[in-house]
């Protein structure tokens, strides 16, 4: 070996190695699945690059993975004749975990072995799983198209460092040799290895081969002669593209294992959809909904999308053009007959075929989720907990599917008064009271703030259901989804609450009478508060609270203004409308108060209380405290 160098693992890589060996030990056979999966990917990449440069095959176009073991040396070797790696690529891919969000990943680890193993699976440990069973790993590799002298050897014990050196390697591709720990000799068994390959890698589209010894001619149980066979490498797996098989040929277990292969996930998927489409565009899609959200779901820079194949030839990972951003959690494969084999990401950006494929895949996912929501509440609620907030991005991005997406939404409401978001818009509409033509909602910082808001008092009294919205995205969502099924979304904290037909004629007459009786009182309060408020008026939305503030119809809602301020965005200046409950004893007493100074202090205090209740804070808390103290002594 020449040009030998020692390198230290990056801190994150060393940390992950120790953690992974501890957390994944109970499922240690997955090391073979990971290494075979990587080898198959290397073959896919070579096949694609060879489309434009046939010399990369080096007169050896039969791509395969080979698996062997040596019981005396206690080694297992996985080799492929795929794309291979250069020295720089070896250092980049094997010396560090070149992934964004690694530190976020570590922050999410809980110390719970089951949960952590699931998270590590989401992260995609790949090659590093070798160290679960091996105390030393040797990698010999040469990149396709490079001379034999340009091979690279990588050696590590999986502790703090690794060695890289130049070697001579006749064949292209990668050979990984695992030097097993003394207590891992169970894997030095032909039957055991064949069983693991069949279990995890049957769906790999290239053959995974193991050596079969020659046999002599013998006599069978029925007396017939069994002919001799020559020693040969034989395929252990089916080696067919799983998505190209008909659904009737496939078992659920095969679908699940294929998902784990393409998604780098240790858990089964929640559900999937396998479809073959013929006609103007011919394509096959196999789309999966994961059971858990990845730790980096909100990292918009992270690549996402489907594995793209053209006529079963791998083209690219993370082809995001075929799935809208609000469905970025979907994993799967798209195999098109209509795209050119030399397709690039740039070509995909703006083609009629791409638009048709994207529309088709989007429809499949929305139909799949609709079906799941109808047949399995528990499974759909699990999906909603993990991905609901991402799905709420849908109406803004995909206006053509607004109603379909809206049907999938789940919220908390006054019907359940639970933090669990289980109420669909269809269920809400089915419970609407006679004469109700609006979907009422409230947005707040938290579920409890929404649930206990005074703005709900009259609606609760009348038995009118209100959606309780406390996700940060909710206010923005409703700006893009103003109505559903012909019913307008109406905020109970914005504008004058017009209950229309829900109020009796008798109640309306009583309200008109109160407007007249309290007119001079309202003017006195306006005079005291001046430009602190946009308007003062009587309210009919309160029953047990003396006052509240609301945003005017044309102004930004309090919650939206708060969110924009938190994000450092400029917020348009607006003042609240101050509403007073004429049936509350405090308001009745205030209306009769002759002392103008006391009247002013109580009016200010009621406004500050209403602001505190709605916004959660005051511009000048000390003034508020001073006012309370003054009134306590009055």
From Swiss-Prot:
Database matches in CDD domains: HATPase_Hsp90-like
Region spans: A: 1-345
Residue ranges of coiled coil: none
InterPro entries per UniProt: HATPase_C_sf, Heat_shock_protein_90_CS, HSP90_C, Hsp90_fam, Hsp90_N, Ribosomal_Su5_D2-typ_SF
Keyword annotations from UniProtKB, A to Z: ATP-binding, Chaperone, Cytoplasm, Nucleotide-binding, Stress response
Similarity field: Belongs to the heat shock protein 90 family.
PANTHER family xrefs: HEAT SHOCK PROTEIN 90 FAMILY MEMBER (PTHR11528)
Name of this protein: Chaperone protein HtpG
Species of the source: Psychromonas ingrahamii (strain DSM 17664 / CCUG 51855 / 37)
Phylogenetic placement of the source organism: Bacteria, Pseudomonadati, Pseudomonadota, Gammaproteobacteria, Alteromonadales
